[in-house]
Amino acid sequence: MGGFPEATGNLLDAAAQEFHPTVCAPYPLQPLPQQLYCPHPYPAMPVPPPPQIAMLQPVPPMAMAMAPQPGYTLPTTTPVVNGPSSRVVVLGLVPPHAQEADVAQAMAPFGAIRSVDACAVASEGVATVHFFDIRAAELALTCVREQHMRQQSRLGQLYAAAAVAPAWAPAPTPQAWDWPHPNDDGRGLVLGHAVWAHFATGADDGDNRGSLVVLSPLPGVSVADLRQVFQAFGDLKDVRESAQRPSHKFVDFFDTRDAARALAELNGQELFGRRLVVEFTRPSGPGPRRRGYAPHQHRPTAPTPPRLQATWRPSQPTSSQPPASSSSSGSVRAREGVVLLRRSSCKSSAGSDQSSKGGNAGTSHERKTKGGKIVVAAAAASSSTPTASGKQTQKGVGSSGGGSWKGRKSGWEARFLFKEPEAGGGADTQATPASEMDTRTTVMIRNIPNKYSQKLLLNMLDNHCIQSNEWIVASGEEQPFSAYDFVYLPIDFNNKCNVGYGFVNLTSPEARVRLYKAFHKQPWEVYNSRKICQVTYARVQGLEALKEHFKNSKFPCDSDEYLPVAFSPARDGKELTDPVPIVGRSPAASSASSPPKSRAASVDRLGQELMPAPSSSADGASSTTTSTHAPSEHDEEEEEGDIRLAGELRRLGYDD
């Protein structure tokens, strides 16, 4: 055969025996440790394990295990956890099929649970548990870590002997097996699985973190006397004086429910010859809450995570300013629990509000248009128009010159704009005699999310009126209450969405000013909208003029929710007057002969005639078609629709 002359026969002998190496490796291959499933009660172990070997300190769950060494014993308790304690415990390595009820059932033996957030269990194996008592959270973390370390010890016992003992060494003498632990009752396991836990530092965000501060000076009252008063409401963690202000006393409760009960019972009560002023301790670190903090706004005593937070409305404001005008008063909420408007910071509002000033008057005149005769509110000349908040750059249609139409100008004549409030003052009514106050009451609310319904708009106005009227009662000022008697939210009947603006008639100029201060330049928080609410005067003013404007009009729709409505008596949130349509509606079938878009355009024109005239200083627009469909949720498309709308209004002659 070629290549090996001395070889005879076939080298690949089929009858040859299988080759076996004669030299073995000194250490066998070590299999990777696996997560054990430990149902409760624990099953009996059939085979005794190798000698007990444990690690010195607990190891986080995803860390690589070090080679165990013999001669060490397992600590009986988990070492003290470094870092501050919290009432929020984050669980890791949670079984992906676990539900919120399973996590709550596993953590319930440690103490009362405020809420459980298990939305990240399926994707990340993480669940968040909020306890009322910080002692319950500490106990839960200790037990969960003990269970995890006990399982790591068992894994070490299973695989350590193979890693340290040679193959020729004699078998070790069986020792006692700690399965199950004599004091183990299954606590700390989630569906029989050992998990890991750590505190969520900074996640216990809210007014009530179990800490109160007594602001009223109490001369001659010691910390021991104060402890005796507050400990009647629950166990105290600490009572101390402020290092910066010794007159302020801090009282820390273990349980947030005890702190809320103490605040409700003692705040404003006569004690030690003084009226107690008690508040929740503000956050000590920097952040938006630190910058925009306002004392004691009566928020929920036990705030839940954002996904689980319920609707809440204060029963009585205590601030010296209207809740809607306070930078930290929170957002206006609808009755169904929808967050409507998000308050912006004081600095940003003040910076944008001081950009300009405007003037207005209260006269009116009539004007002929293609749609008939309408009443137009006239005003004196004004100085300048404010810069609208929003994007500074965008794509424009029919724009002339650099910059954007919405970013540089407000787009409306100055006589339809509110006089911006100066620093520390109000709008329109600040230092203005009653005889010179603008008497207009009808406003236009712009940049409404297109999915907003008339019902949500009424809920928003009801909440605003309730808060404003409660502030008037609490402050003792003699002002007309906030109420409204007309609402119109134009709807595109093709897709059942609003067209981005609406009209409201208030019952007094003071109510109009309060609505402006509450809503103008505030972002919405519904439907993931990034629109900025804007409030201007409407072209047609007064309830009677609005009724005359819609006289003999019929809307081709099948629901009264799409019609302009009036309220008699006026609606103020507590007096929930039913809306009464001021126009008729024709069945959709009777108007089938006309194109849908033309019908929508005719109805939309009635709403456009209520709008203020666009400013002549705004960029020109060459568009000759009106967009009657609801704008897209994308900001650029919405802004392009506003540009086309302004151009169409100028084309129709509304440019004086």
UniProtKB/Swiss-Prot annotation:
SMART domains: RRM (SM00360)
A cellular component annotation (GO) from this entry: nuclear speck
Matches recorded under PROSITE patterns: RRM
Compositional bias ranges of the Low complexity kind: 314-331, 377-397, 585-601, 612-630
Disruption phenotype: Plants almost double the number of leaves, and plant height are reduced to about the half that of the wild-type. Internode number is increased and their elongation is significantly reduced. The terminal tassel (terminal male inflorescence) is replaced by an ear-like (female-like) inflorescence.
Compositional bias (Basic residues): 288-299
UniProt keyword annotations, A-Z: Developmental protein, Repeat, RNA-binding
Entry annotated with the keyword RNA-binding: yes
Record Pfam families: RRM_1, RRM_2
CDD domains: RRM3_EAR1_like (cd12530)
Region annotated Disordered, chain positions: 280-408, 576-656
Compositionally biased residues, Polar residues: 346-358
SUPFAM superfamilies: RNA-binding domain, RBD
Biased composition (Basic and acidic residues): 642-656
Tissue expr: Expressed below the shoot tip down the flanks of shoot apex in an alternating pattern. Not expressed in root tips, leaves or immature ears (female inflorescences).
Top-level taxonomic group: Eukaryota
Domain RRM: 211-283
GO molecular function: RNA binding
PANTHER family for the chain: RNA RECOGNITION MOTIF-CONTAINING
Function: Probable RNA-binding protein. Involved in the regulation of leaf initiation rate and shoot development. Seems to act more predominantly in the early stages of the leaf development, rather than in the later phase.
Protein name (record): Protein terminal ear1
Lineage per the UniProt record: Eukaryota, Viridiplantae, Streptophyta, Embryophyta, Tracheophyta
